[in-house]
């Protein structure tokens, strides 16, 4: 476990390791959480004993994205810190040389959806939900999440999710390619995730990492270039004049 207790690993055998997101109660994203996640993924990616990673949450919500009550009060430094966390955290996952299976047992919303999009195989519970709500809370996309969304979602799905901010259920998510398999219950979710991880773990590891980089290398390079050009610290901050009111509307339920 990390010092903060946010990340916990469990050996599932045959080199497969479960990485549990444990920032209770809904895996709300913070700068520290995301940077610890990036460091842990980098560590696992370089560990020769790890053949595949299963990413999951012990909570009813997989990840709810930002804590809006907290985020609406962010000053410039805090805005830059969370942008850096989003960029670095999801870049680490997207570029991880090891196979990653996301076992999505609940809602994955806004920034929380990028744990799913940056994984290699995605299993969704029959009651899971998926959305990119940034437009509804008055925030655009940092360079890392933006490039991952553009690379993993077709243009029609980008329109459906990113321009409306509305969530979709598991069947629509499978139709749109966000998830590959739907599990009817939590037991099946674990069974399917482990099954898919075992399949991936049996592949030649160097070749898997090489092919993954062939597919994702250009996107990774664009994210790194964007970060180098100041993408972790946007001038004037991440938020705009509409953000606080939009977040307050969402918190009150008027943004539903």
Question: Where are the regions a protein language model picked out?
Answer:
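C-terminal long alpha-helix characteristic of the crotonase
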Residues: 123-128, 179-228, 253-256
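Well-ordered beta-strand positions
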Residues: 121, 160, 164-166, 172, ...
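Conserved CoA-thioester-binding segment of acyl-CoA-metabolizing enzymes
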Residues: 1-58, 91
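Glycine- (often His-adjacent) and acidic-residue-rich active-site loop
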Residues: 35-36, 49, 56-89, 136, ...
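CoA-thioester-processing core
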Residues: 89, 109-162, 192, 196
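Conserved catalytic cysteine-centered active-site region
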Residues: 90-102
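Structural motif
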Residues: 56, 103-104
